[in-house]
Amino acid sequence: AHPPVSERVEVLRDALSYFDRQREEIATDITTLMGKPLAQSRNELNGFFERAEFLLETAETALAPETLAEVEGFHRRIEHVPLGVVFVISAWNYPLMISLNGVLAALLAGNTVLLKHASATAPIGDHFEAAFGNIASHPGLLQHAFASHQDAGDLIRQRQVHHVIFTGSVQGGRAISRPRRSRG
């Protein structure tokens, strides 16, 4: 059985505190990796926290079961259940925000995450693993993988990946979509 959404929210809120404790280091990493001015890197962190708070605040409502109108002889209901392993493939240009969208939504929904960050900003993925991969009560929720598009395609071909969230280039998208289609 998966923990209730309310418990996931609290566990993930605690995990996100890593980003606050490491705020200046993360901003400096973004600046070093991308050449962004430090002020812009700090602003991305501000946006990151706003987005995270929105996802945390809306999770219980968004993931609540939905009862649909009755049809004679049927009780209809939509339940949001975890898929399993979600492979989040993230772009480089907003290394925190783009990753957060897929990572936090997947974790809130009760999934585990394999994160492949863009090679240009791969060290940012280490911060996600430090925050979400080492939660004492839920170890291994997130693993950061260093992988080429080809390697990512090979991972997708395997049945251990249950869902893929991709943000990136057209070339990367093509490399990722071919193996996904071959799974059927």
Predicted feature residues:
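Rossmann-like NAD(P) dinucleotide-binding subdomain of oxidoreductase/dehydrogenase enzymes
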Residues: E66-G184
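N-terminal Rossmann-like NAD(P)+-binding subdomain of aldehyde/semialdehyde dehydrogenases
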Residues: A1-H75
